[in-house]
């Protein structure tokens, strides 16, 4: 459950999941996920498996191949769906379809999806992140064993470009 309040003098958000450790065993089923222990939990602790599987099936039907999906390390209810790597412009379009599918499928299951980057204090972050691989002649461009942090000059320029234009990118990327 996600809620928010916006008024002239206050902005707040709330997030709750029945299986979260802070709720105790509210539904009496004994399936509370301990703090920082949700990573790859199996059913019955993975209460979002059916919903997440349907999301992935719909993504596949829309031409977005999925590498895997699983519960994430943070609080109960956080999960990761990783699409296969693909051509950047195609994946940029796919990211919008992915968010659309996630929001609507969550609603179908009586849940609320959020991409808030840090919804719960003291827990692992949430939100949407991307994996990027830049190739030239079939070889990765970002890696350089002799470069600072094992990154190539191109990788540093790429990250610098993202940082320089991040305000504009955020305005366009939801």
What are these model-derived regions, one by one?
Residues 1-174:
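Glycine-rich, acidic/polar active-site loops that bind/position phosphate-bearing ligands
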